[in-house]
Amino acid sequence: MNIEKVIAREVLDSRGNPTVEAEVFLDSGFSGRAIVPSGASTGTHEALELRDGDGRYGGKGVLRAVQNVNEVLAPALVGLDASEQGAVDAAMLALDGTPNKGRLGGNAILAVSLATARAAANELGVPLYRYLGGSNAKTLPVPMMNVINGGAHADNNVDFQEFMVMPVGAPTFREALRYGAETFHALKKVLAGRGYNTNVGDEGGFAPDLKSNEEALEVLLEAIEKAGYEPGKDIAIALDPATTELYRDGQYHLESEGRSLSTAEMVDFWADWVSRYPIVSIEDGLAEDDWDGWRLLTERLGDRVQLVGDDLFVTNPERLARGIETGVGNAILVKVNQIGTLTESMDAIELAKRSRYGTIISHRSGESEDAFIADLAVATNAGQIKTGSASRSDRIAKYNQLLRIEDGLGDRAVYLGRRALR
């Protein structure tokens, strides 16, 4: 199962921006392909996404990253065993030699890392989730469906980035997807009835100019009920306010409401919402380096809701270990391009599970038809996945792959529902 050839090319993501696609060819004739995603709101501590910075594509071209694959990584990987994922990833990390993959680019390294796993699975003739997770890979994730977009994901006056529905009361993944899709369509009617536009944002959710951040919760509850479900029982609410984007000079600025909050006031804000709405998960409720604030938030709400670190942990085992040691958060969002290799991503998931932290596999706002994360969610029995709304084919590709996996597992498939939450 030795690597014979590696090639990369520049392709486009769901926002029309360039990204890296890699193909790994084995001496057996089998191959694997992968496209890396790209984020809009990115954590400071993420692996470097190498962009060209020239006149092409407004500076967002990735020809340098492609060149690094074709001229630096490819020659070094020829002859390595594709089934030794750790060794392949370690070789690429050694070639890069920087803590943030800043020399070759996290996007270059990740594309090859994921394509290698696909090639190995293809040669063995097993589904990717089974190759990565073995015979115990059988848990379908509860979807976090981002149906209202704001913040950096939409051009509107909603401060918080994502308002999501979680079908925690569904019996199977297939039914969970139906619950979410029906709520999405009901929400469109609710918004139209209030005179709001029903255009969608980067992740397929609606992006209306609401009167306030809280109105997003109100229309969401109305949509859940109009779809025939009970808020909190059948469908709960999850939030990603992406507060790092709102944090300046020690204050959280809610521009749509014309006010700024201290860390303690932001914690009070979340406690109030949790007490009045069926919110079960808050991601990045405070800024990425507000560690003292995160401790306060965890002490206040950690036994009531899932507190997810995205920008806080950036899928980095070292930052996650710090969070575990200091009692910060209780769940991690896993984005493979934040850390830049499959091995490091799975290390972070394993550390989280050992420490009884929740795990959510996540897309980015700039996606593609590649559905790798669907297989990764099942492979690791993560229990939760965040991959957009019931709209846009780049999001639906992941849901459809999960439907295929559920069918393939048959009676062995497990859907945890509310039990998946930390």
UniProtKB/Swiss-Prot annotation:
Bridged cysteine pairs (disulfide): none
Protein family according to the UniProt entry: Belongs to the enolase family.
Name of this protein: Enolase
Job description of the protein: Catalyzes the reversible conversion of 2-phosphoglycerate (2-PG) into phosphoenolpyruvate (PEP). It is essential for the degradation of carbohydrates via glycolysis.
Active-site annotation: 203, 335
Cofactor field: Mg(2+)
Protein's pathway: Carbohydrate degradation; glycolysis; pyruvate from D-glyceraldehyde 3-phosphate: step 4/5
Keywords on record: Cytoplasm, Glycolysis, Lyase, Magnesium, Metal-binding, Secreted
Catalysed reactions, semicolon-separated: (2R)-2-phosphoglycerate = phosphoenolpyruvate + H2O
Biological process terms in GO annotation: glycolytic process
UniProt xrefs under HAMAP family: Enolase
Gene responsible for this protein: eno
Binding site for (2R)-2-phosphoglycerate: 161, 335, 364-365, 386
CDD domains: enolase (cd03313)
Gene Ontology molecular function, alphabetical: magnesium ion binding; phosphopyruvate hydratase activity
Domain of life (superkingdom): Bacteria
EC number: 4.2.1.11
Catalytic class of the enzyme: lyase
Positions that bind Mg(2+): 240, 283, 310
GO CC annotation, single: extracellular region
InterPro entries the record matches: Enolase, Enolase-like_C_sf, Enolase-like_N, Enolase_C, Enolase_CS, Enolase_N
Cell compartments where the protein resides: Cytoplasm; Secreted; Cell surface
Cofactor note: Binds a second Mg(2+) ion via substrate during catalysis.
Keyword Lyase: yes
